[in-house]
Amino acid sequence: MSTQATHVVPARSRSALFAEQTYAGVLGKLIGVYLGRAVEGWSYRNIREKFGEIDYYVNDQVNWPLIVPDDDISGTFLFFRALEDNGFPRDLAAKTVGDTWLNYIVEDKTVLWWGGLGRSTEHTAYLRLKAGIDAPRSGSSELNSRAMSEAIGAEIFIDTWAMSNPGDPERAAAMARAAASVSHDGVAVEAAVLLAAMEAYAFVESDIDTLLDYGCRVIHHDELRRIIGDVREQCAKAAHWRDVRRWLGDNHSYAHYPGCCPMVPNHALLLASFILGKDDFQEGLKIAVSSGWDTDCNAGNLGCLNGIRLGVKALEQGPDFRGPVSDLMYVVNADGGECLSDAVIETRRVRRAAAALSGETYEPPAARFAFEYSGAVQGFQLCPLHEGRQGVTAVGNLNTTGPDNGLELRYEALAKGVTGSVSVPTFIDPKPRSLSETSYFEVVASPSVYATQTVRATLEAFEQTSPAVRFFIIHYDGGGELQRISGELLTLRKGKNNLTWRVPDTNGLPIYRLGVELVSEHRATGRIAIIDLDWSGAPEAFVMGGAFDLSPKLTPFDTSSYWIKSFVSSARHFAPDIFSTFCLSHPGANGVITTGSRDWVDYQVSSKLTLDLHKAVGLVARARGHRRYYAGILENQTAKIIKRTDRTVQVLAEMKYPYKENLTLILALSAAGETLRFAIDGHEVLSATDSAYAAGGAGFLIEEGTVPAHGFAVRKIAAATAGG
């Protein structure tokens, strides 16, 4: 059944075309997951009785947010960082991907369904890795049983391996095989390989049958080939998609396979939806979600495949799937400042990997927000906390009607008493996202913007007389309420305007949203565009004081203040301490607690620690996950500067430094260029040089003990000082 024409790559740059297809694949993944997430776990019968067919988002009908943290999204965009973190190896080893799991996953909190050893396949594989069992044995059926190892999870994280190898299905298949074997085995790995090969091939080939034929050639599993052949046969003769769903239920339901979420039923349903949906993006997702089983997984994979194959325009043929999403996504992981992300940022990451693997160069835009893809808004929306009438009537992209990129803001009837504003989330939402005993986990993140950083933006005014603008932040106060701080009004002249704004001090409290407000004394209607917007580098002086400075009404029973939530903790216990600021506590090795992001380059981190029971304690800098960082620590009467890389801890410098129990010391760790300096009570005691980590977050390290920490500060080191 061949109904689609072969895709011919135009004469223009293949890399530009692949970039657009990658963005469409990322968007398709998000749309599919968000569409299917609302009915994940529902039976086919219950979906049919409640909704009939699911053509569009139904999250509001089940009282759940649309944008949620999801294992399908976080795992997909995390695990492929094994490429970036290890120099983009073309010959990817399963062990490398397994080490990446351990670096970014926060146990019992992020990415995975934490259902228990022998119940959740991914949780089981994580525990194997943690125990020192390397991949691929960590995911083997010999160790974990066939029921565990042949579950669906092998393919749900697989899309980025395909998008990192556009037009190279052979290498995509090899990488997918290595990555899938971290947690799975047998038919689950083969199904993941087939899907990755099809997605990589879809960059240059759009015919459904050709893609399926190729996918079947790269797998090593005759039974899976037979099942796929049967699915294709049923789809060819079916009068309606429900006829195929009935056949799948009779022959390949969960009752036919071991485990709680087997691969084969879902893979068969995914391919049936792919075939029956033809070139209709919405139709394919409708079938995948309306058919039950693992709805978000199947729809997410299908959305990515068809996004790549059909392009962004196909996502816009039916209802507005893109508007409610606004490119937003959570990539929940130990690298907390990277959690709040968007489809453009993740597309850049994938493109960087693809370019490196193919020997090409890729220079992404310098600004965080450059809106370079068709219709991209990168999370900017009409500000949901705008007070009074909203004067901005539409948010879009200049590139939908012309050659330029930029966030287009249309405003109407601005005047005294009526302003307009847009904003973008920079930290977790006040509304909970988790649900106990499910894979609905809470957002674990650090803010992406901090007090005393500098916002730089280029705004283009199209009218002869334009409204003034001002930047603003909305931050959490010590009681968890939202407060707004606005900057001064800035005049816009027709044409492009370069603006800067120093983010005001929040006394260490986290910033929830950053926005731009339009203000006019006289009635104004028209449009402006944000061409780019960025903040980068460590904050000038981000300072957190004592616990009561942060939360004046704090009690000993308050354990989840938003300023505590701004840190990502792998330590077993991390909470406010009413006598200092933080309580750092961990019963084993490598209890890491961090905040900040990957654009923090040269800075000093400092805190006052009281040396209670501990094996090791100190400060972390340039953390890129929780198993890749520098630290200045005190351990066994010795001061050390260490570098951790996965399981390896290297001492870069050390000296004897006798100290007594309950002694209070001010520790400071500086990273500037390749130079690391460790100071105690204002005196430098150690220095070292290393080039492994150029930037990253800051925080604490605690091992086998509990230590109170009073205050926390991060101060930028100027370029001249860093180089001097």
Which positions does each model-derived feature cover?
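Extracellular glycan-recognition regions
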Residues: 489-498, 510-724
